[in-house]
Regions:
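N-terminal Rossmann-like NAD(P) cofactor-binding subdomain of oxidoreductases
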Residues: 1-204, 235-236, 308, 314-315, ...
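Charged docking surfaces used in two-component/phosphorelay signaling
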Residues: 186-358
């Protein structure tokens, strides 16, 4: 695989910092540019971040001396890279405009932002689940009038614990899903130092999260038709999302009903044997085993299991029959790894493997 020069837009924020750490020594991607707001532009990355480095590992040497570019100067950034990752904190309309500006400058965008998730010709991809949705990109390029440029996005972090667990079971006709998510403070871009209100507390509301948790799975399970992605009609989802005092690792408590109820053994077999396109293509960031089931009654736990397979796997446990639904179980994944930057890097690896950056 050839090496691609990569930029990170929003490089000084928490997810941007995670991108920087993941790109260190990446076999396919070389960090060539960092961009942020105008107030950071002109400083070295080390100066711009200052004492706001939030990762547990030291700032990579490859990033420290890079001069931060102004993210709004699209042509300047685009000229230095083959594609960009985008993780900015702006209004949704501003994000849409910025990402399309990069795409129209013939610089593909792999986005961690939510702004384009329901743009009909923008693929929202979890590589193990709906890798085929990247085939919409030629239609998007036609709309944008580009030859190389496009926007591709990853899904919301909340659903990346439970949708992968449900995906191998779709053959049994999932009709109804109730999910309660327990989401770490990393999902708000916070640490315990910057979010003291969460200590000894649970906040029972995360703005917009429940709607995303109910609607986005249906786009992931949709299909391409007439130059757009058409969402699936089923199953019916209902969700509640809570912020909990955990540094990293989102959990889901899932209740599921089937048209053709499988046995517990069939469910466990489906999870154990599941492989997605990311595994078949042997992408560098892909976990060898995407879904892991724990037999112990008290697993999975964020503290013990969030870094399973370098934080890119989904952990599942406590599968039981239910007296109102058919089954219930719990699941866990690492928000800042598979849920945010890591998921976007994996998507970029898929796009590279399929030739979309060439």
């Amino acid at each position: 695989m050839k090496q691609y020069n990569v930029g990170v837009i929003g490089a000084t924020g928490m997810v941007g910092q995670r991108f920087i750490t993941l790109l260190e020594n990446h076999p396919w991607f070389h960090l060539a540019a960092v961009a942020a707001s105008a107030r950071s532009a002109g400083k070295t990355y080390e100066e711009a971040v200052g004492n706001r480095w939030l990762m547990k590992t030291p700032m990579p040497e490859c990033a420290k001396k890079l001069v931060v570019l102004d993210a709004a100067k699209v042509e300047e950034v685009a000229a230095k890279v083959d594609f960009v990752f985008c993780a900015v904190n702006m209004k949704k309309d501003e994000i849409k405009a910025l990402e399309e500006a990069y795409a129209k400058a013939e610089c593909p965008v792999v986005s961690n932002n939510s702004a384009h998730r329901f743009t009909p010709d923008v693929p929202m991809v979890v590589p193990e689940i709906n890798a085929d949705h990247i085939e919409i990109i030629p239609a998007q390029r036609k709309r944008l009038g580009t030859k190389r440029g496009f926007v591709a996005v990853k899904s919301n972090c909340s659903l990346q614990s439970y949708v992968p667990a449900l995906h191998p079971l779709r053959g049994y006709g999932i009709t109804d899903v109730l999910v309660c998510t327990y989401q770490a403070i990393s999902g708000a871009g916070k640490t315990f130092e910057t979010f003291p209100d969460i200590l000894d507390n649970v906040i029972p509301y995360i703005g917009g999260e429940e709607e995303k948790s109910e609607q986005e799975p249906l786009k992931l399970w949709g299909h391409i038709e007439d130059d757009k992605i058409v969402s699936a009609d089923a199953p019916r989802f209902t969700a509640q999302c809570l912020r909990v005092p955990v540094s990293d690792g989102h959990m889901g408590a899932v209740f599921v009903r089937f048209a053709n109820k499988p046995s517990k053994e069939e469910i466990l077999k489906a999870w154990k044997e599941f492989r997605g396109p990311a595994q078949d293509l042997d992408l560098p960031s892909a976990p060898k085993q995407f879904l892991h089931y724990f037999e112990e009654n008290d697993r999975p736990q964020p503290k013990l299991d969030r870094m399973l397979e370098n934080g890119m796997a989904v952990s599942i446990g406590r599968l039981r029959e239910d007296n109102q639904y058919d089954y219930k179980f719990v699941c866990l994944y690492n928000k800042t790894m598979s849920g945010a930057a890591g998921g976007a890097v994996l998507l970029a690896e898929l796009l590279a493997a399929k030739g979309y950056f060439d």
